[in-house]
Amino acid sequence: DLIEESIRICRNFIEEFVSKGISVRIISNGVDMKTKQEIYIREGAGANHVEACLKQLSRMDIYSATRDMQEIIAEQQATTNEVTLLISAEQTDALAHAYMKYGKETALSTWLVPIHRGDKKAAEQRMSWVPIRTNYLVMEELEV
């Protein structure tokens, strides 16, 4: 499932960034299965922060209804020197526009799109107009 893969990818980035002293923050439309609140984790670094992030990600209810991610992105404001990484299999024009505005279309913005092997060409064509660096992660080609 692409949602579960997105969570796994997020976990890997959190661990990698924090191990290099880079603070991370999570903005998600995923809902905590216990609190029923959207998952949002303030910026931080260190082992306790990683543990808090992983705990929240593990409690994400992947079957619950969620708000559109572009709404959540629009509510946040990125700073001009902030590196942004969007991990989402959703590829809508509305999300692309919201992310471009949030990331201010800088070279510091990247969109990782988990997809299945047969969907790559169509995904690349669909999002070819997006000026943000977009990388497609083919699930069948990733090491587990």
Region locations from a protein language model:
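Exposed, interaction-prone extracellular/peripheral surfaces
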Residues: 1-144
